[in-house]
Amino acid sequence: MTTVDSNTTAPEPVVDPNAVSVTINGKVVAARKGEMIIAAADRTDDFIPRFCYHPRMEPVGMCRQCLVEVVGPRGPMMVVSCMTPVADGQVVNTATEGVKKAQEGMLELLLANHPLDCPVCDKGGECPLQDQAFSHGPGESRFVEEKRHYEK
């Protein structure tokens, strides 16, 4: 039989000094200081489109496909989620109309000079760019200039 001393208090919960609280699409997420927004969003199952981001590499932010909206003191602002670290109390939206429009615009620019010969391409259905165009693309391009052609 064990006895409990009523004078003992429960230990204080350990608080991680490197943790910050971020709200992503209305969900509160615990993230590490310095962690990029895109990595924190991945843990909430809020997929942010990307081409140049890989969790095991340094972020470069070249494709701009991972744009999200961060609500700040001066209102919402578009930021590149693979290059922007989380901050305590930050509010991030990944699926607003403005974000979707910006992501479509970036994808449209990536496709602007891309050859549109997907049926005969060597990648034939295994192309991340093609997958992104189908899932996050605008459907049609505003650019009608002639594309670059390469010898096969």
Question: Where do the protein language model's features map onto the residues?
Answer:
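Fe-S ferredoxin-like electron-transfer domains
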Residues: T2-V4, T8-T9, R64-K152
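Terminal leader/tail segments of proteins
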Residues: M1-S21
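N-terminal cofactor/phosphate-binding cores enriched in small/glycine residues
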Residues: V20-D88, E97-A102
